[in-house]
Amino acid sequence: TSYMRKMWPVVERHLAWEKRNFDPDGDHLYDAYCCIWASDALYYSGGAVTHSSAYNYRANRVAAIIADKLGVPSERYHKEADAIKRAMNKGLWLNDGHWAEYRDLMGLQRVHENAALWSVYTPIDCGAGSQQQCYNATRYVDSNIPHLPVRWQSNPLYDRIFDCGADTLYTISTSNWMPYSWS
């Protein structure tokens, strides 16, 4: 725990920085800027973003666990994690059974319902959803994210290894957006 104790002030400052910069309105839904590998083509413009909120949910949940182990106050991190999860369920979870990509900050505050793959796997990986939500979100991938067939010539060796025929392999697109870049 000596390393955790040494690094704890860094964790505290970083989470305060995240909150100050990416949740300035205090709604517990975080904007995303340079947050994932696809960031250079995304323009959330201060909106409430699913994957960024999920990352901050996980960060606060883990910070609370570390604080408890160190014997330092952890309530603020427990509360923020719980508030993020509630806000995600209220503001970003859709009746269709998946998380939205994001909600606009300005104007009509539209909810962008066509989530990309990272807005499915990130909240699942971060533990931000119930088992039912996680299952429903993966069904969204099955029914809404393009599955692009991989064409290959059947080979008995590969057929035994993969237990499939030439028409059953797919790669999954990251989204169903066209054009890819939007704002």
Q: Can you name each region flagged by the protein language model?
A:
Residues 3, 28-32:
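Acidic, glycine-anchored loop motifs typical of Ca2+
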Residues 24-25, 56:
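Nuclear receptor C-terminal ligand-binding domain
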Residues 5-16, 43, 47-75, 79-82, ...:
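Active-site core of glycosidic bond-cleaving carbohydrate-active enzymes
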Residues 31-47:
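Aromatic- and acidic-residue-enriched carbohydrate-binding clefts of CAZyme catalytic domains
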Residues 19-23, 29:
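Glycine-rich, aromatic-flanked loop segments that form ligand/cofactor-binding clefts
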